[in-house]
Every structure is written in C-alpha cells, then in structure tokens.
Amino acid sequence: MSPAKVSANDVPMHGNGFYSSNSALQHSAMLNALPLLAAAAAASKAKQQEEQENSRPFAILEFGSAHGNNSHTPITTVLKSRAPAPSREIHLQFNDRPTNDFSTLATNLTTMTWPVSNAIFTSLLPASFYSRVSPKGSVDVAFSLAALHHLDRVTPVPPEGPIPTHEVRQAEFRAQAHADLLSFLSHRAEEIVPGGGLVLSFVGQELGPNGEEITNYAGPVDACRSAMIDMLQAGVLSPAVANVFEVPAYNRTIADVRRTLAEGEVVAAWEVEEVFERKVVHPALQELEARREAAPGKEEEHAEWYARTVVDWLMAVVAGYFVKAVREGMGVTDQTVLDGLLAEWVERTRGRFLEGHRNEPVECWFVYVRLGRK
C-alpha cells in the first residue's frame, strides 16, 4: 500500500494533563504486568555477567509513555528486581509519538524518585515505536503497557462515498495489527540485548461462547455513539464527521497474538515466556460503591460523579480523533468552535451514559506477554 493511500496514526492522548488525570483503568491494567516485569528483570540478570554489563548503562525503555503517570511503578519494579551494581549508571528512556505532550511527561518525571542510589539519566524519545528508537544492543528491559492496540497507519475513510462495512474494516485492521506487532518485535530485537526482557500489555478482544465479540467498555462506547447521533440529528455535526470519525486501533484476540508470536522471525529472536489475558474493571466502580455506602441519600450525585469519571476516561483517548474528524469532515479550523463541539459531545455522552448505563461496570480485556531475547 503506497504512503499516499494510508493515514498515519498521529493523534496523541488528550494533553495538558487531562490524560494523566483520567487513566485509572490503565493503572489497574498495569498492576497485572508487574509480576511479568519482575520476572523479566530477574531473568535478564541471570543471563548476563555484571562485569561485562558495567561497560554500558543499565537501560530501561518504555514505549508509549504518554504523560508518564503509569511509568513509575513498572520501572521501580524492574530496579528492585534487578538491583544493578551501585557503580553502574542507569538510563531510563521514555518513548511516544512526536505529537505526545512531552512537556507534561517531563514535568511528571521530575517528581519521581527511584529506589536505588545509582546515577540515573533520563531521555525522552519522540518517535513512533513502529521504528527503531534506541541504538542496537543497548536496552536491558523494555515494556509497553496499554499502547500496542493503536495501529501504525490505516487507509483513511473518505468524508463522502461508500463506507466499508465493519467486517471489511476489521479484516483490514487485523492484518495491520499483525504486521505492526511483527514490525514492533523486529525493532525491539535490534535494541534489546541477548538475555534481555520485553513485557507487553494491550487491549484485547474476548469472544463469547458462540464466537461473538464482547465489547470492551460497552457503556461509555454506546453512550458516545448515541451522543454523536444526537448531534447529527440536531444538525450540529455533518454526516461527513461520522463517516471519518474512527479510532485506528485493533483489539487482538489471544489467537491473533499467538499467531503473530508463532511467525518464524519472532521464534528466531524471542523466547515466549508468558501469554495470557485478563479482565480489568475501571476502579471508579469500587469508589462508587464506597461513596454510596458512605452517603446513601445522594444517589444522583454519586451517579453523576461516576458517569463523569468513566466518560472522561474514554474521552482522554478518543477526544483527539473527534477533533480530527470535525476538522476533516466539516472543515472547521477555529479552535474555539472545535473546543465547543467537543465539550458538547462530552456533555451529551455523560447524559447518555446516565440514561442507559447508569452505574454499570466499565470492563476491558487485556492481553499480557513476556518475551526473552535469545
């Protein structure tokens, strides 16, 4: 496919700290990856000689750091599990797309402290993780949490004309996801030293007993779709916005992941140590239950808080794609108008969630992978 026929996925998470404040589900998903990170760090130490390692820094690389709010605990886990010699320098590297809010990331990193006394150096790497981002053989442990379901690029949907069916679009996305993961692992094989470790988690696709897809975070997704339909019917948005609005992500089934990991080029470079899936529930549900128990007479207030929390969580990821669709579908360039339309969509989505999904659990399946570099 020629570059002219594809659209790079260059929309970042919502900036200015909004994503940082609305990534609680990603935090819960990250906690499931900590045992894998500890195992990857321990295995890396067991397979390498400290005398040889001291010729270079001990390097940890995170792919898809966003604003860094879920970076500290994984890196701390690696450092506690690996414990480099006190004289060895440590290099922490944080990668995301060039459009990421690196200012917020840098600010968040300055507040972090680490459980070792080693000299620590930090780098920010603005580049697609579907390319090389670090020198060959320079990384000991790498990880990517809640990012790899975002595709590198997709064929854009035209504002006017025939719209591909869901089945056709999913088949295209599935093929792209397979190619993307192969590309990602190929680049990581260049960067990670033999004996090093790689831990991944990303949104997965659970299937029902008859093979049907179980929608992740079904309530907020349905609410935002209904809100957009309301805006279309009210004439606030043009049909072209609905045509081009799309989040270029693919939720892999566990079978999709195993198929990619079984490819010859992957087998040649990596030991597959662990692959599993797990359901993650947005932690706001637990807080909602605590609020209702503490103040049983304020049900409406609690429901509104919960709707705002889970909708804002979804918007932290998809708001940029909505703005992009309004720009492309309606030709709107005035930032005040864009902000106003986004605010209306968010408010309508909260209302729709309260109407049809009040206090529902927000659930998402994640796939977890631990690989060892041969």
Curated annotation (Swiss-Prot):
Description of the deletion phenotype: Abolishes the production of acurin A.
Parts of the chain that traverse the membrane: none
Induction: Expression is positively regulated by the acurin A cluster-specific transcription regulator acrR.
Keyword flag Glycoprotein: no
Similarity-based family: Belongs to the methyltransferase superfamily. Type-7 methyltransferase family.
GO MF term list: metal ion binding; methyltransferase activity
Entry EC no(s): 2.1.1.-
Binding sites annotated in the UniProt record for S-adenosyl-L-homocysteine: 19, 70, 96, 128-129
Gene Ontology biological-process annotations: methylation
SUPFAM superfamilies: S-adenosyl-L-methionine-dependent methyltransferases
Protein name: O-methyltransferase acrG
Binding sites annotated in the UniProt record for Mg(2+): 245
Organism this protein belongs to: Aspergillus aculeatus (strain ATCC 16872 / CBS 172.66 / WB 5094)
Listed Gene3D superfamilies: Methyltransferase, alpha-helical capping domain (1.10.1200.270), Vaccinia Virus protein VP39 (3.40.50.150)
Pfam families: Methyltransf_7
Alphabetized InterPro entries for the sequence: MeTrfase_7, MeTrfase_capping, SAM-dependent_MTases_sf
Record bears the keyword S-adenosyl-L-methionine: yes
Pathway: Secondary metabolite biosynthesis
